[in-house]
């Protein structure tokens, strides 16, 4: 299945990033430790805060979430656009049972995801983002804090949800991710959600990831899965 022109052009950019990362001097890059292929240690259907509690919602957030939970029980749920292969957005792509690849370049950092080959490029130039229209992947900008990659993303469309249970967000949500190596060669990502319209205060959750042996990021084409009678998103037990 061929990708859209946008996806094709973005792939070429990611190829360029990969070629730069493959340069003989790339192995000595101080931040190369976060590069490579990663897979989540778990695949939560519902996000909780770091202390294991439900995210603190406003009245509007509670209303939207209850509507999504009710819709999930219907014959044809509409709250989750990924069911018809539309982009699930971030941070949800990082909670799904698919590997993803991080490609590190001095000027940009690329993320390539296994589900329907979604990808994003993080601007490392230090310039602030200037969102034109809300997008599933938003407009990410990043910087290094020691070995940690810090990404701030805004311009995220409210058409996406934060997790499979239907946690909502608004177009004004700000997502901050702190990505850093931890013990045993793992990667930890700490997510901070700031969205006053939906959540009563900023809240954080975190995930850990490992290098899956012998696993590559391949294009799991969503429409092909549906044509075979399979769910749009693979079940976790089928991906471990």
Language-model features and meaning:
Residues 2-3, 25-240:
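Hydrophobic small-molecule pocket/channel-lining residues, especially in calycin-type beta-barrels
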Residues 7, 20-26:
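Short intrinsically disordered, low-complexity segments
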Residues 2-13:
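Bacterial N-terminal signal peptides that target proteins for export
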Residues 11-21:
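Bacterial N-terminal signal peptides
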């Amino acid at each position: 299945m061929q990708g859209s022109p946008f996806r094709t052009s973005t792939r070429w950019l990611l190829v360029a990033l990969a070629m730069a990362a493959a340069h003989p001097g790339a192995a000595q890059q101080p931040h190369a430790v976060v590069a490579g292929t990663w897979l989540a240690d778990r695949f939560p259907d519902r996000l909780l805060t770091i202390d294991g509690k439900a995210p603190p919602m406003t009245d509007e957030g509670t209303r939207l979430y209850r509507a999504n939970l009710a819709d999930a029980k219907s014959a044809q749920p509409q709250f989750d656009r990924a069911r018809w292969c539309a982009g699930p957005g971030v941070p949800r792509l990082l909670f799904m049972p698919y590997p993803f690849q991080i490609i590190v370049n001095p000027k940009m950092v690329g993320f390539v995801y296994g589900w329907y080959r979604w990808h994003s490029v993080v601007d490392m130039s230090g310039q602030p983002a200037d969102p034109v229209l809300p997008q599933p992947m938003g407009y990410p900008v990043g910087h290094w804090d020691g070995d940690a990659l810090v990404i701030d993303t805004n311009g995220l469309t409210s058409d996406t949800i934060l997790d499979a249970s239907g946690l909502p967000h608004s177009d004004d949500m700000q997502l901050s991710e702190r990505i850093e190596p931890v013990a045993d060669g793992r990667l930890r990502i700490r997510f901070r959600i700031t969205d006053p319209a939906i959540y009563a205060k900023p809240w954080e959750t975190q995930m850990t990831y490992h290098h899956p042996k012998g696993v590559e990021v391949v294009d799991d084409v969503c429409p092909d899965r549906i044509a075979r009678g399979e769910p749009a998103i693979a079940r976790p037990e089928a991906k471990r």
